[in-house]
Amino acid sequence: AKLIQRANDILIQSLRVRLFPVTAPPQPVDADFQLRARLLEARDPDLFERDPAALLRIFIVYAQHPELAGFEPTTLRALWRNTIHIDAAFRANPAHRALFMTLLRQPVGITRALRAMHRYGQLARYIPAFGRIVGQMQHDLFHVYTVDEHILTVLRNVRRFTVSTLAHEFPLASRLIASFEKPELLYLAALFHDIAKGRGGDHSELGMIDARRFCRQHGLDKPDSELVAWLVEMHLVMSRTSQKEDTSDPEVIAAFADKVGDPHRLAALYLLTVADIRGTSPKVWNAWKGKLLEDLYHATRARLAGSDQAMANIAAKQEEARINLALYGLPKDAADALWQHLDARYFMRYSVRDIAWQARMLRWRVTSPDAVVRARLSPVGEGIQVLVYTPDRSDLFARICGFFARIQYTILEAKIHTTRHGYALDSFQVMDLANRGIHYRDFLSFVEYELARDLDPARPIQPVPRG
């Protein structure tokens, strides 16, 4: 398929030049290349045979000129014909290795240049391990791209974090990468994170070995090489932890923080993880997964900063929540009646938005003998968020889960907390996976009323439908 694609490109460009000949003189770029009608052209047809380093330099020039639409057909044919010169000796040449790293350090055009290298065969020749996964399908429920396309999509996603005009898409990722001194390390991790798929064995460990070797060969010092290798080895850990473990559990956060080690690695892993999930399929990423990752990042960051920083973060959350409550005309002490019964773990688990909402909903019900149920549209993504506050008892969780099972709603997240005075303060993120088109305003009232009825201890536990 790639061969057909390359031949097709050459044919189309050749026909375009013949049908629409360019009369304007070319614009010189340097001693080797020039621009002709938005196409990049080698000034000497024998350039690549005479100077094989130009096989890499042409892509640096291509990255530096975003106005270019492609390559002049004669140059494209010469590029394709001379790709055979990218062999073991070529890859071992320090000058060529320096050129590849220069490409990865360009301020713009990196993704476009690497996609062109892939399209015309140079990337697979320069990184043989990449050549082995070209066109390789991934037989799982999530990946919709071949391994090579997935890798380049992940790299593109990392690059998008650096674009200031797109900062609104992922504000945290944008802030983190802006302070990342060497973003090329992230690009290398993206290139190698799945490069060992299909070999047998753990592709994370095999890819780590490839990445470490490549980095050391390309002049990266040991700390930088180890960071890239570590990212490749650990690239699945953050997503698994955020989606499969209780990240409100301090022991889970402590274990994850031990694996990460320091804030710099945490930031790098977060950036790669977000880019990786988004590059799996257009349907896999959602706002809920984004929130899980952000929560894990912030909790781990606080853990790495130490207990003093954690307490400072709690105080900051409380102050911000008070400001939020003031927007509803509530006094500064409106939350005190509830907060006096809550420990530090509660404030570490919840966002400011959730803390303020729960305080507002429970202000006059802190010692209510009856169950309090409040529901709202989820502030992150689809579905609804349900707050349950009631004197704690042993059958409470079973009753709540049974209710959502009966109305055919899936529980995406459950946060269970017990106050100092013996009340359960539980929060549920639920979603109608069947997309039945329910009118949410009426449905929120239904949940608040019916779930509160089901939690009446005088009522028997309702049966859960089977099948």
Predicted regions mapped to residue ranges:
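Non-catalytic interface/linker regions that flank or bridge core catalytic/transmembrane domains
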Residues: 1-143
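Conserved catalytic alpha/beta cores of large enzymes that bind or transform nucleotide phosphates
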Residues: 83-104, 159-165, 177, 215, ...
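Short helix/loop capping segments that flank catalytic or ligand/cofactor-binding pockets
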Residues: 50, 66-70, 124-127, 163, ...
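Regulatory modules associated with amino-acid/nitrogen control
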Residues: 1-44, 110-112, 120, 251, ...
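Divalent metal-dependent catalytic cores for phosphoryl transfer on phosphate-bearing substrates
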Residues: 1, 6, 146-147, 173-306, ...
